[in-house]
Amino acid sequence: MVAVTVMRKSRNFVGPSPPTPPAEITTTLELSSIDRVPGLRHNVRSLHVFRRHKNSGPVVDGDSRRPAAVIRAALARALADYPAFAGRFVGSLLAGDACVACTGEGAWFVEAAADCSLDDVNGLEYPLMISEEELLPAPEDGVDPTSIPVMMQVTEFTCGGFILGLVAVHTLADGLGAAQFITAVAELARGMDKLRVAPVWDRSLIPNPPKLPPGPPPSFQSFGFQHFSTDVTSDRIAHVKAEYFQTFGQYCSTFDVATAKVWQARTRAVGYKPEIQVHVCFFANTRHLLTQVLPKDGGYYGNCFYPVTVTAIAEDVATKELLDVIKIIRDGKARLPMEFAKWASGDVKVDPYALTFEHNVLFVSDWTRLGFFEVDYGWGTPNHIIPFTYADYMAVAVLGAPPMPKKGTRIMTQCVENKCIKEFQDEMKAFI
């Protein structure tokens, strides 16, 4: 293994440029009922790997066209349009009065350099030859990382490539919203004078049903889940989609196929008792259900999703054909409009946003349709993206894309313990 040194050259806050007008310094922005879900006050971390573009040369200190310098300047400009990302959280989530104060304090930005090329570390493929801790930004000692809405670290490599480490607090934006902000930074980095999508803050557009009495606190038991990643070709996914259409006369998505396979493989590998209920949960975008109130041109970047939970007994998930498991998931997705409408009108007795983190719940996140893979700071789109949406008390599967030029779906999981990992891997490998 190559010995690699990552040196952080500067660490400081980047404020809006031009600076926030004095009249707005103390502006307080209301959060929506979804933003205020206590479970969303956590950091979403990811690494975005950009290979050397054919027209770019080696990184040279003092060059104003270095990725770190360009992105830093663009970030400052973007914060002028997105002042909440330069602000700070105030109030209490538990009390229901959390807000964002537009203080202009800025986003945390780190410039770093690695003494190797991306090829020397295998393009940052798994297993990672540079730890995530070295490539992700961390605030100064004693500072709560969830108190800063967004943090970035740009690590430049000797080949001209770079890795952008992004840490964003989920309270402020969902995946689509975070990608919208990063896209704005990229557009300004490429020299655009005006953002293609104007940001919309107005959180009053989101339904605000009566608050339900709090249930029992969630369990945060550590399970020791192991990481496993595999790539599924586009042809394999297309074959399953065709089979599903022939069987049920309906279309299914790549998400449906990949989620069903992971759910089935995990259920088989763990060996749950046949009668045990197993669940798969994912955050479904609900912007299309709020078209009457959200701007027609888009731009709303707050949390706008609904947690869809699909439930079946372990015996069905483990023993039925994959196509049948896909149908279970699709039937659950079909209930989204009705369930979201009931929640919005206050016609629910259990808060769907109060998540539980039990062993029999698999959380799935799809990163392929958020917009991160289309971001271009001037050196082309990312070669690949590594999300770190893992917590040891959550069984997680993340859908992404394999490094270019490969096609297909990358399934990144952390959902079974070491004692079950081989059987899980065998189940997944048999599928591909």
Swiss-Prot record:
EC number: 2.3.1.-
Keywords associated with the record: Acyltransferase, Transferase
Domain of life: Eukaryota
Keyword set includes Transferase: yes
MF (Gene Ontology): hydroxycinnamoyltransferase activity
UniProt cross-references to Gene3D superfamilies, sorted A to Z: Chloramphenicol acetyltransferase-like domain
Function statement: Involved in the incorporation of ferulate into the cell wall. May act as arabinoxylan feruloyl transferase.
Protein name: Acyl transferase 5
Gene encoding the protein: AT5
